[in-house]
């Protein structure tokens, strides 16, 4: 742990001033202003994230990608209206295409199935608390998972949703099998991608879900290897519902019922490190959603300097508080703030209101005994 923190500090120090120089050189098509410093930063990146390359040509290619990503990180930070910081992450040697292929949905976008329903107006409350963080209640939110090169964010988000709701309703912590959702799904496409409702349909079809311990994550799917019938179920769902695309209602449901899943545009997450992302529809298209995560809370930041102060009509040196959502990702704890990130709350940042989906958990229904009359 100490070595990792030390390397992170070295990376931050080495990035100071380097990104601006690289950004300027890319504009002028110059090979690079400070190649030695860039290579030193890249070496630190390789050590921290255990990267090695097969030949000098591949090394040179990844170094060039790293330089472009470093310049892009600075540009993203300059354009962001919140408090987000961007920089070197585990994905800094990947192109946009590689990143999207490995971590986003690969299936074509589709409509949610008719099984889910929107909650009726009679079920909505009016009062929403100022803050909510389900991580603070022991046993509700399981550890941050790492999907590796398997495009299974949809399955991990669904499993996390059921785990949290089960713990809240029955006061029983469970860690559920993502692998069962991948191996046994009839609608999802395993490690090639899927949607959260695919996972919920699988749980309904299989009459429950096994534990992670009993059916562990492999990060790959083999044909005809579904073991659902051979594994004991530890959690069940009654159905699943699609919430309205209204952030106030989503906040109320989250605070009163528990964590839900959302599917967002992950464009700005590749180089994200910490802070609140406040994007515009131009910088993060809310209609192009490609990554499912678990929404675990919301809050409001302390007063911070307004990055919008340079905009027309804004007061210089003004300060403001920023409302935000708290989201759990599936890229491991070395990404973001321990595997979590925050999005601005109130303007459908990155499409967070497009598919707010949640299961509703319940014990399996007991069949009434039937006997023939004498």
UniProtKB/Swiss-Prot annotation:
Keywords: Disulfide bond, Endoplasmic reticulum, Glycoprotein, Hydrolase, Protease, Signal, Thiol protease, Zymogen. The gene is CTSW. Glycans are attached at residues 205, 347. Belongs to the peptidase C1 family. Pfam families: Inhibitor_I29, Peptidase_C1. SUPFAM superfamilies: Cysteine proteinases. One of its GO terms (cellular component) is endoplasmic reticulum. Residues 22-127 form a propeptide. One of its GO terms (molecular function) is cysteine-type endopeptidase activity. Transmembrane segments: none annotated. May have a specific function in the mechanism or regulation of T-cell cytolytic activity. It comes from Felis catus (Cat). The active site is at 153, 291, 329. Residues 1-21 form the signal peptide. Its EC number is 3.4.22.-. One of its GO terms (biological process) is proteolysis involved in protein catabolic process. It is found in: Endoplasmic reticulum. It is an enzyme of class 3 (hydrolase). InterPro entries: Papain-like_cys_pep_sf, Pept_asp_AS, Pept_his_AS, Peptidase_C1A, Peptidase_C1A_C, Peptidase_C1A_papain-like, Prot_inhib_I29. This is Cathepsin W. It comes from the Eukaryota. Disulfide bonds join 150-191, 184-226.
